Amino acid sequence: MPMYFEEKNSIRYGKFGCYDPFPFIRAFFSTRIGGVSRPPFDRLNLGMTTEDERNRVLENRKLFFDTIKIPQSAVVIQKQIHEDRSAYVETPEFLDCTDAAYTDRPNVFLTVSAADCVPVLFAETKKKIVGVIHAGWKGTLKNIAGHTIEKIKKQFGIDGSNITAVIGPSISEKNYEVSEELADQFNSRFIVKNGYAKPHLDLWKANVVQLKNAGVENIFVSGYCTFERQDLFFSHRGSGGKSGRMLGVIGMNY
């Protein structure tokens, strides 16, 4: 499986087998298992933009980062805005108004927040570059995954063949019904109509294609649907719009 789980201190989190051969890469994805938040944010809500009690989210973040042994002082948090803006990061900081970030520096841990939108984690294993992408339907429509990779290729003079990317837990095509108006904005190969009363959008496929078109050859899809697995993950759509958030985390130690 591209993604497997570990549990420590009652905190369950995902890891990615594709990064296991590279000990300098540290990549994780939180679940809702563990933590102190109350319904509907139970339990390990890591999202500060939710209506959850701030002190509980702060406690959850401490529990999560302590468990995966990453100091919060080394963490980069984004204020995600559903656009295609990306940022090169050299030191831990708060990023205002971005949906993608990347770094070639050790001990800088990038995060992406999600609860149905597609979280992408990636690593260029030769030049030692890591990054995250937040791709909801708006970002996907703007080709944020492709634009981010192309920006990195130009900045570092690489071709993308040594980039390994992961599509993290997010809503699957089966559960992502969209309007005809929205469906018409996407390439038809990402829209499924057969068997459904309304169109369904395949964000996994769309982001895989965008990454491939940008030269990424190694792409793994976790296969976990947040809508279907609300026992493990938060789902904005599945909860009627009131849910917690997970964090994908990637960085390097060397």
Residue ranges and their predicted role:
Residues 1-254:
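Active-site microenvironment for binding and transforming phosphate-containing groups
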